[in-house]
Design a protein with these regions (language model features):
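Feature for soluble, non-membrane regions of globular proteins
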Residues: 1-221
Length: 221
């Protein structure tokens, strides 16, 4: 049984003017779909054929199967990291944890932005919660993912060129500025306070097999 491309949690034009309808159509319908389709082909006949995609990224060797599984998960998580009428700052325990780790929310934004704009080549930048409860800003190159480790992703920014080239050409820094106007802190707060069991973690990358009843997604606004 193969996996389906998850639907966007909002309309294609919902993130304008910061992210265009054309970008979402290409990014979701072409790039994300290609990773899901390739993953479905590569998993056939392997020992992971009946495994959840989250299990695959934790246990598969680095290579084509891992890369496409990770990229499928990363993109699913990224769509929920954004939302219309979002931006601003988080609240409550997450904001307190960010201030504890970075000194202030503005210092956190500066550090995250520098890591996103400065990442060499393609990849992702994540805010993660470590097993000890502390927060880190993590860069992952190409198709790598923190879902393969023990830290829990809270929110992420895709810095592959296909995420921003239609709207911002080669100006990645300007794209990162726009990211902050779309950042879905309610989603990040839910991830920060959620339990660590497999069922709760699976809701953060809602890829479902065809015919499977989907989990209720996190709010995107």
């Amino acid at each position: 049984m193969s996996y389906e491309l998850p639907k966007l949690p909002y309309a294609y034009d919902a993130l304008e003017p910061h992210m265009s309808k054309e970008t979402l159509q290409y990014h979701h319908d072409k790039h994300h779909k290609a990773y899901v389709d390739k993953f479905n082909k590569l998993i056939q006949g392997t020992k992971f054929e009946e495994s959840p995609v989250g299990y695959v990224v934790k246990h598969a060797e680095k290579g084509p199967l891992f890369n496409n599984a990770a990229q499928a998960i990363n993109h699913s998580f990224f769509w929920h990291s954004l939302g219309p009428d979002c931006g601003g700052e988080p609240e409550g325990p997450l904001l307190d944890a960010i201030k504890k780790a970075n000194g202030s929310f503005e210092d956190f934004k500066k550090d995250f932005s520098e890591k996103a704009a400065g990442l060499f080549g393609s990849g992702w930048v994540w805010l993660v919660k470590n097993p000890d409860g502390g927060l880190d800003i993590v860069q992952t190159a190409n198709g790598d993912t923190p879902f393969s480790g023990e830290s829990r992703p809270l929110i992420c920014c895709d810095v592959w060129e296909h995420a921003y080239y239609i709207d911002y050409r080669n100006d990645r820094a300007k794209y990162v500025e726009a990211f902050w106007k779309l950042a879905n802190w309610e989603f990040a707060e839910d991830n920060f306070t959620a339990g660590a069991d497999a069922e709760q973690r699976s809701t953060t990358h809602p890829m479902q097999r065809k015919g499977q009843h989907p989990h209720r997604p996190h709010s995107s606004h």
